[in-house]
Curated annotation (Swiss-Prot):
Keywords: Methyltransferase, S-adenosyl-L-methionine, Transferase. The keyword Lipoprotein does not apply. It comes from Arabidopsis thaliana (Mouse-ear cress). It catalyses: N-terminal L-alanyl-L-prolyl-L-lysyl-[protein] + 3 S-adenosyl-L-methionine = N-terminal N,N,N-trimethyl-L-alanyl-L-prolyl-L-lysyl-[protein] + 3 S-adenosyl-L-homocysteine + 3 H(+); N-terminal L-seryl-L-prolyl-L-lysyl-[protein] + 3 S-adenosyl-L-methionine = N-terminal N,N,N-trimethyl-L-seryl-L-prolyl-L-lysyl-[protein] + 3 S-adenosyl-L-homocysteine + 3 H(+); N-terminal L-prolyl-L-prolyl-L-lysyl-[protein] + 2 S-adenosyl-L-methionine = N-terminal N,N-dimethyl-L-prolyl-L-prolyl-L-lysyl-[protein] + 2 S-adenosyl-L-homocysteine + 2 H(+). One of its GO terms (molecular function) is N-terminal protein N-methyltransferase activity. Its EC number is 2.1.1.244. Alpha-N-methyltransferase that methylates the N-terminus of target proteins containing the N-terminal motif [Ala/Pro/Ser]-Pro-Lys when the initiator Met is cleaved. Specifically catalyzes mono-, di- or tri-methylation of exposed alpha-amino group of Ala or Ser residue in the [Ala/Ser]-Pro-Lys motif and mono- or di-methylation of Pro in the Pro-Pro-Lys motif. S-adenosyl-L-methionine binds at G96, R101, E118, P119, V120, L149, Q150, Q165. One of its GO terms (biological process) is methylation. InterPro entries: MeTrfase_NTM1, SAM-dependent_MTases_sf. Pfam families: Methyltransf_PK. This is Alpha N-terminal protein methyltransferase 1.
Length: 276
């Protein structure tokens, strides 16, 4: 993959392969394990609050949820209601769920069940507490998995939607591809992925502090192709502070969509600022 990038300390890399060799070695499972351990350790030192998980930008929560809801409503209508019917029992997986922010403010209102996946125990404990009185008998958080994304293997065919937001940057490229290849089997027929992530203006930006990588749009699309996923629809998130990375939403399907919907992305300067 011929993609150049930089890290948060200003070091330049001529290729993504060069960066990964430095960070996780080649076939060095010990070094790769440490990469993941360091990433979790960073978040273990963060307060289990909206402001904490959003990197001090708690005020972006409303804009984020509004943008996600507009995107999700269209997808549910096109992909599920029109094809299966309005009365089916819908189940979602919230990947990198943190304290349950997205589940509480969005997913639990549209899905009958939501499972939460989060490797940081204190965040998941906070999610249980935050969601204890949220929803209803027919719209509720069901399972709380304290498992890293790269190790998660749920029941086959359980989910209508797998929501991946501000967490996939912690996975290496190989584990990114492995996760989505496994996750295809987690989806029900007609189900889809939503990936919502920060975008680097060019190439990639490696954050040395939290051990994550912010990928560019072409970088993401290369990885999606490697996963055998089809780009169904995209949308740029609006209303975020200028100093943050641009944020883009991708809807991805296993089946080939009849038409690909694209929107023109606005680019902003790279900033080593990761929000979760």
């Amino acid at each position: 993959m011929d993609i150049c990038g930089v890290d948060s300390e200003g070091k330049e890399f001529n290729s993504v392969q060069e960066m990964w060799r430095e960070e996780i070695g080649e076939g060095d499972e010990t070094k790769k394990t440490q990469w993941y351990r360091d990433g979790v350790s960073y978040w273990e030192g963060v307060e289990a609050s909206v402001d904490g998980v959003l990197g001090g930008y708690g005020h972006v929560n409303d804009a984020d949820i509004i943008g996600s809801e507009v995107f999700l409503k269209t997808l549910l209508q096109e992909r599920l209601v029109n094809n299966v019917g309005a009365n089916q029992h819908l189940v979602a997986l919230d990947c990198g769920s943190g304290i349950g922010r997205i589940t509480k403010n969005l997913l639990i209102r549209y899905f009958n069940e939501v499972d939460l996946l989060e490797p940081v125990a204190q965040f998941l404990d906070a999610a249980r507490e935050n969601l204890a009185s949220a929803g209803s008998e027919t719209h509720k958080a069901t399972n709380f998995f304290c498992v890293p994304l790269q190790e998660f293997t749920p029941a086959a065919g359980r989910y209508d939607v797998i929501w991946v937001q501000w967490c996939i940057g912690h996975l290496t490229d190989n584990d990114f591809v492995s996760f989505f290849n496994r996750a295809k089997g987690y989806l029900k027929p007609g189900g889809f992925f939503v990936v919502k992530e920060n975008l680097a203006k060019n190439g990639f930006v490696l954050d040395k502090e939290d051990h994550s990588i912010t990928r560019s749009d072409p970088y993401f699309k290369q990885l999606f192709r490697q996963c055998g996923l089809h780009l169904y629809r995209t949308k740029d998130q609006k209303g975020l502070p200028q100093e943050l990375f641009a944020v883009k939403m991708y809807a991805l399907t296993v089946d080939t969509p009849p038409k690909i919907h694209r929107t023109r992305s606005k680019t902003r300067s790279n900033r080593p600022q990761i929000i979760k």
